[in-house]
Design a protein with these regions (language model features):
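Two-component system phosphorelay core
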Residues: 1-133
């Protein structure tokens, strides 16, 4: 499976750039209008959306249920800039809409990507100053 958004790609010097973060923080900053407190709140909400929908995805028993959770994961991921997770969900969503069977390996890929994103969020929240005023 070719990656649409590779984590690394050679630049003009032939050297690969640093690995991409699980969340594009520039995109998130733009979405939160540059408000660091709002960024953290968005990350907290996104973390819960991902947690719940990955769990429901793993428990889903029908293709429509799987599609609904994939679509939610993809949409939420695009909103915060979690491009890798969005890509995994998008690929599986397209395959299912094209008539493929539910692929357990793709669900595992989504779970692994979600765990990476959630760990990144936990680190960001733990390291953040208190913005409550």
């Amino acid at each position: 499976m070719a990656a649409q958004f590779p984590a690394q790609s050679p630049n003009q010097t032939g050297l690969a750039p640093a690995p991409r973060l699980p969340i594009d923080m520039l995109h998130l900053a733009k979405q939160a209008l540059g408000d660091p407190g709002l960024e953290l709140e968005v990350l907290r909400l996104f973390d819960e959306v991902v947690r719940v929908n990955v769990l429901r995805l793993e428990e889903a028993t029908s293709a429509p249920d799987v599609l609904r959770h994939l679509h939610t994961i993809r949409g939420a991921s695009v909103g915060v800039g979690a491009w890798g997770l969005a890509q995994h969900a998008h690929i599986m969503e397209v395959e299912l809409r094209d008539g493929a069977e539910v692929n357990v390996e793709h669900i595992q890929d989504i779970r692994i990507s979600a765990e990476e994103v959630r760990a990144f969020i936990a680190e960001r929240i733990a390291a953040a100053p208190d913005y409550a005023d």
